[in-house]
Amino acid sequence: MTAVVLDGVATASAVKSELAVRIRALREQGLVPGLGTLLVGDDPGSRSYVAGKHRDCAEVGIESIRVDLPADATEADVRTAIERLNSDPAVTGYIVQLPLPAGIDENAMLELIDPSKDADGLHPTNLGRLVLGVQGELTSPLPCTPAGIVEMLQRYDVPIAGQHVVVVGRGLTVGRPLGLLLTRKGLDATVTLTHSRTRDIEQEVRRADIVVAAVGAAHLVKPEWVKPGAAVLDVGITRVVDPETGKARLTGDVDPAVAEVAGHLSPNPRGVGPMTRAMLLANVVQAAERDARLAAELRG
């Protein structure tokens, strides 16, 4: 058996094409979606990540609003920048790029974000809505990586309802919100969330119809852990140094040999990562469409 590749690049491209159509419709109404980014410091990885988001925006027709602060910015500087993004009508949604410099309370800064402009879907208010909204349509932004995982599974016709999903990792950006999302009515999965204190994690993974590895441990999930035919999504990334060349490379949580056992497998890179970026755009477009509906209601 050779796994069907869950191609995140191709799937994200399809999502972005659909978003571009919706964005054109918004522009025809005089509404231009805008994504803001707040970057503090000059970390090369963060700069590259933010630049990629703005390239995505240009590709689909979303305006970019970029706020860059120096590495020695104070917490007051960051607070002022967030307040500016909250009040700027050109900003439909925005992100605060992490990590922030030492001495700045990240959680306190993130809580200052207007929940309606939370493009990452990780504001406490929006996570709370995900907890409470077990059925019906959610109008609040969803965490991007969990939403991207669900979107990719659905587009590849991988069954979710009634399936046993094992998530390796309980982080805030993937593990915890993914469990909440997958157990909502309409998706109806049974989810086991594993972590460093889980007993016999291999046995837990072997029971899974869908495995999501999001812990940041290189090649943790081995072929013998995986039930034949299971769908496996490789989310975690670790920077591993090649002892022969001395060069670092990005490595996923899933051993490549899992491809000979799994029914579906997302590569890493080019798997879930592009879907995360696409769902960030989707959150911005959804917020713009919400604003359009509110404007129409006010006009009567």
Curated annotation (Swiss-Prot):
InterPro entries: Aminoacid_DH-like_N_sf (IPR046346), NAD(P)-bd_dom_sf (IPR036291), THF_DH/CycHdrlase (IPR000672), THF_DH/CycHdrlase_cat_dom (IPR020630), THF_DH/CycHdrlase_NAD-bd_dom (IPR020631). Keywords: Amino-acid biosynthesis, Histidine biosynthesis, Hydrolase, Methionine biosynthesis, Multifunctional enzyme, NADP, One-carbon metabolism, Oxidoreductase, Purine biosynthesis. It catalyses: (6R)-5,10-methylene-5,6,7,8-tetrahydrofolate + NADP(+) = (6R)-5,10-methenyltetrahydrofolate + NADPH; (6R)-5,10-methenyltetrahydrofolate + H2O = (6R)-10-formyltetrahydrofolate + H(+). GO terms for molecular function: methenyltetrahydrofolate cyclohydrolase activity; methylenetetrahydrofolate dehydrogenase (NADP+) activity. It holds the Pfam family THF_DHG_CYH_C. Homodimer. Catalyzes the oxidation of 5,10-methylenetetrahydrofolate to 5,10-methenyltetrahydrofolate and then the hydrolysis of 5,10-methenyltetrahydrofolate to 10-formyltetrahydrofolate. This is Bifunctional protein FolD.
